[in-house]
Amino acid sequence: MASEEAKFAARADRLAGRQGVAGFMPASARAAQPAPTNRYIMPQFVEKTPYGMKTQDAYSRLFEDRIIFLGVQVDDASADDVMAQLLVLESQDPNRDVMMYINSPGGSMTAMTAIYDTMQYIKPDVQTVCLGQAASAAAILLASGTKGKRLMLPNARVLIHQPAIDQGFGKATEIEIQAKEMLRMREWLEETLAKHTGQDVEKIRRDIEVDTFLTAPEAKEYGIVDEVLEHRQ
């Protein structure tokens, strides 16, 4: 009997490994799993095309309309996704605008600069639209859209602040290297925001010394966006 139970347990563990079903996992494995979230499950829908029926999700449908949705933290993975989409859309039609919707808490400075450089590199104009929030690194991406094509919804907000060091420990020489790199990144951020907003570098320097939150009208006045829209035009 014990051997049968052992066989069943082993089979259940193998099945859990294949399916990733928490209920099939041993207690030790379940304890190691992240807590469940209430994330909304993105539905898929079926659309009729000249080539037959096609099933896709909302993000794929938006991409067909040349819309990129940045709705997560800015990190290496999301940066790669955004850059790949920008390059594909340029190759499909270099003369049509790309639209980037942003609702992001920010994230990695290096990942953000990779997206920024790609936005400046490609030929199509990049329209940026802030829904919800564009914080930290995401605020730079919002401001770096094509001038005159940077939009924001009325209840969205922007946060700008200075970059921070991921690690503040190590050998003295390593800390010195990190500090120099942080100062270099801060100088780049100040100059880039000044370039895209028209603000004086000294004002940018003062404003990012602490967390500075901007409402949609304030972001427009600051020069981060060009228009605040309540309805699609």
Swiss-Prot record:
InterPro entries per the UniProt record, alphabetical: ClpP (IPR001907), ClpP/crotonase-like_dom_sf (IPR029045), ClpP/TepA (IPR023562), ClpP_His_AS (IPR033135), ClpP_Ser_AS (IPR018215)
Pfam families (UniProt xref): CLP_protease
Keyword Protease: yes
The entry's keywords: Cytoplasm, Hydrolase, Protease, Serine protease
Subcellular location field: Cytoplasm
EC number(s) per entry: 3.4.21.92
UniProt xrefs under SUPFAM superfamilies: ClpP/crotonase (SSF52096)
GO BP terms: protein quality control for misfolded or incompletely synthesized proteins
Principal localisation: cytoplasm
GO MF terms, alphabetically ordered: ATP-dependent peptidase activity; ATPase binding; serine-type endopeptidase activity
Reaction(s) catalysed by this chain's protein: Hydrolysis of proteins to small peptides in the presence of ATP and magnesium. alpha-casein is the usual test substrate. In the absence of ATP, only oligopeptides shorter than five residues are hydrolyzed (such as succinyl-Leu-Tyr-|-NHMec, and Leu-Tyr-Leu-|-Tyr-Trp, in which cleavage of the -Tyr-|-Leu- and -Tyr-|-Trp bonds also occurs)
GO cellular component, one term: cytoplasm
Keyword Protease part of the UniProt annotation: yes
Active site residues according to the UniProt entry: 136, 161
Protein family membership: Belongs to the peptidase S14 family.
Function field: Cleaves peptides in various proteins in a process that requires ATP hydrolysis. Has a chymotrypsin-like activity. Plays a major role in the degradation of misfolded proteins.
Record text on subunit structure and interactions: Fourteen ClpP subunits assemble into 2 heptameric rings which stack back to back to give a disk-like structure with a central cavity, resembling the structure of eukaryotic proteasomes.
Protein name: ATP-dependent Clp protease proteolytic subunit 1
